[in-house]
């Protein structure tokens, strides 16, 4: 793979892609097992050295056209974690806090409330879209409410990832309200915070629709997808693009993603997402 990507990497660097200021990328991570921590830390060190990491507040400033101090002349990264796996709390404690990095953790409060003995089947059914519990890694767990509180105490942000990680498209009105609005309300009640960030499950363009957007915009300021691309002040705050990252992937591939090498293949889906978000606002 490294040899295949080298020409593309050289071209992107020659064109200066990934070094122009005013935009930012949102990186998406899921479960990170303990044996992968060192690879995640290696990736984080590279990002900090070459591009920098921003906070959710700095991302908001960039969306409004401001360029925070330290972001001039480069495209920084905002780190996000989906699904609320227990491993993410360990990553925050052992690695993010060590480097002073603040991230967003999108969690499913309905799944957290399931007793431990039923969580594996719930993770398989909802997060892994129909798998069985015995098919999952043995140490896969969801974080607890106390761990969510610890993330907040360390300066991280908690966002909603719906109540049970159900695909929003195809749900009836009551089910949709429970997933989108009920999740935010439960997070606010249990954690004593205001929830401004949302990430819809599965992240692809087929997993979001206009009726979902109507509810999202009624409660949240920002909504993240899983569609790759660069965000800027032209990006609708409810149509934020994210690049899924695997800490175990080759370094050349990671750099290719960070430089936007895959954006071209997602541009139409990104456009559809943006139009849907604008239509929810009544902007045509």
Language-model segments: what does each one mean?
Residues 42-50, 95-99, 154:
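A short, Lys/Arg-enriched amphipathic alpha-helix followed by its capping loop at the start of a domain
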Residues 85-86, 164:
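Short active-site segment of divalent metal-dependent hydrolases/proteases
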Residues 1-80, 86-90, 170-284:
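C-terminal active-site subregion of NodB/CE4 polysaccharide deacetylases
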Residues 94, 149, 213-214:
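Alpha-helical segments flanking ligand/cofactor-binding loops in enzyme cores
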Residues 27, 74-77, 97-206, 237-240:
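Metal-dependent polysaccharide deacetylase catalytic core of the NodB/CE4 family, i.e.
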């Amino acid at each position: 793979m490294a040899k295949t990507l080298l020409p593309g990497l050289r071209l992107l660097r020659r064109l200066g892609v990934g070094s122009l200021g005013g935009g930012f990328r949102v990186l998406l991570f899921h479960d990170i097992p303990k044996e992968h921590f060192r690879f995640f830390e290696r990736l984080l060190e590279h990002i900090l050295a070459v591009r920098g990491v921003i906070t959710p507040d700095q991302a908001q400033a960039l969306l409004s056209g401001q360029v925070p101090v330290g972001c001039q002349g480069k495209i920084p990264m905002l780190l996000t974690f989906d699904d609320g796996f227990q491993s993410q709390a360990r990553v925050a404690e052992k690695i993010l806090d060590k480097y002073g990095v603040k991230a967003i953790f999108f969690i499913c409060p309905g799944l957290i409330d399931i007793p431990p003995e039923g969580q594996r089947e719930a993770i398989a059914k909802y997060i892994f879209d129909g798998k069985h519990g015995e098919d999952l890694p043995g140490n896969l767990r969801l974080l607890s409410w106390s761990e969510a509180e610890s993330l907040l105490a360390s300066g991280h942000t908690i966002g909603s990832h719906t109540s049970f990680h159900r695909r929003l498209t195809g749900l009836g009105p009551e089910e949709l309200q429970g997933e989108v609005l009920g999740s935010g309300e439960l997070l606010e009640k249990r954690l004593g915070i205001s929830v401004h960030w949302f990430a819809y499950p599965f992240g692809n363009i087929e997993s979001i629709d206009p009726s979902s957007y109507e509810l999202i915009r009624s409660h949240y300021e920002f909504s993240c997808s899983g569609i790759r691309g660069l965000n800027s002040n032209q990006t609708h705050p409810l149509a934020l693009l994210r690049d899924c990252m695997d800490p175990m992937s080759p370094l050349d591939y990671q750099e290719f993603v960070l430089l936007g090498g895959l954006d071209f293949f997602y541009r139409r889906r990104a456009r559809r997402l943006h139009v849907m978000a604008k239509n929810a606002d009544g902007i045509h």
